[in-house]
């Protein structure tokens, strides 16, 4: 299939041949859910920690004698039912990350791209050239090509030797724009693509993805 390439003004300047699989795959919502859940789990720091009764300082002495006071028996001031006591079933640092099979990741990526393409919110632009990084230029470009009701944009970029220093200048120009998420074509995440109102590719980024999918 052929995908239309747009310039900075949103006008068509050519086409790019890509495999149908990228934008014409069946959308698997269950797989998208699993892939996004995996990405969010892998991001978790898992540093949460509270103290058990064994770890709370103090509480070694019996607060009062066992019998004769009329009060409930108590063996420690650090019991979980006491104020200042330890926690029961306390959270401890743990690793939430887990591995998702490569084939599932691949199908989830094709699903989200096909979903966005089918909803007509995916656009491909020719590669940008810069004399110097310019956020103002890219912010103006985004506001010009973005649909009125769209807010979040996922911008997929790809590095190539032929671009020279333009790749780094593009990153510097885009990274401070509000509601824009940069995505690397070499390691694409499902989460930012799925939750973006619009998805933009540079021509190089789509070419790299096409080569990867073709194998």
UniProtKB/Swiss-Prot annotation:
One of its GO terms (biological process) is translation. It comes from the Bacteria. The keyword Nucleotide-binding does not apply. GO terms for molecular function: rRNA binding; structural constituent of ribosome. Signal peptide: none annotated. InterPro entries: Ribosomal_uL4 (IPR002136), Ribosomal_uL4-like (IPR013005), Ribosomal_uL4_dom_sf (IPR023574). Pfam families: Ribosomal_L4 (PF00573). Residues 43-97 are annotated as: Disordered. GO terms for cellular component: ribonucleoprotein complex; ribosome. Part of the 50S ribosomal subunit. HAMAP family: Ribosomal_uL4_B. One of the primary rRNA binding proteins, this protein initially binds near the 5'-end of the 23S rRNA. It is important during the early stages of 50S assembly. It makes multiple contacts with different domains of the 23S rRNA in the assembled 50S subunit and ribosome. Forms part of the polypeptide exit tunnel. Belongs to the universal ribosomal protein uL4 family. This is Large ribosomal subunit protein uL4. It comes from Brachyspira pilosicoli.
């Amino acid at each position: 299939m052929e995908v239309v390439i747009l310039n900075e003004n949103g006008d068509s300047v050519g086409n790019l041949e890509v495999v149908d699989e990228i934008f014409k795959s069946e959308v698997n919502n269950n797989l998208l859910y699993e892939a996004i859940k995996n990405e969010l789990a892998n991001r978790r720091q898992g540093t949460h920690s509270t103290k058990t009764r064994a770890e709370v300082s103090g509480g070694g002495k019996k607060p009062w004698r066992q019998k004769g006071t009329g009060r409930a028996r108590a063996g420690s001031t650090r019991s979980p039912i006491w104020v200042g006591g330890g926690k029961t079933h306390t959270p401890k640092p743990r690793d939430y990350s887990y591995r998702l099979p490569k084939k599932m990741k691949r199908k989830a990526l094709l699903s989200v791209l096909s979903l966005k393409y089918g909803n007509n919110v995916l656009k491909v632009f020719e590669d940008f050239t810069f004399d110097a990084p310019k956020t103002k230029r890219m912010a103006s470009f985004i506001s010009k090509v973005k649909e009125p009701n769209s807010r979040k944009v996922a911008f997929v970029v790809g590095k190539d030797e032929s671009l020279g220093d333009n790749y780094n200048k593009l990153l510097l120009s885009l990274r401070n724009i509000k509601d824009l998420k940069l995505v690397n074509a070499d390691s694409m995440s499902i989460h930012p693509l799925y939750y973006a109102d619009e998805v933009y590719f540079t021509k190089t980024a789509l070419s790299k993805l096409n080569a990867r999918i073709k194998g």
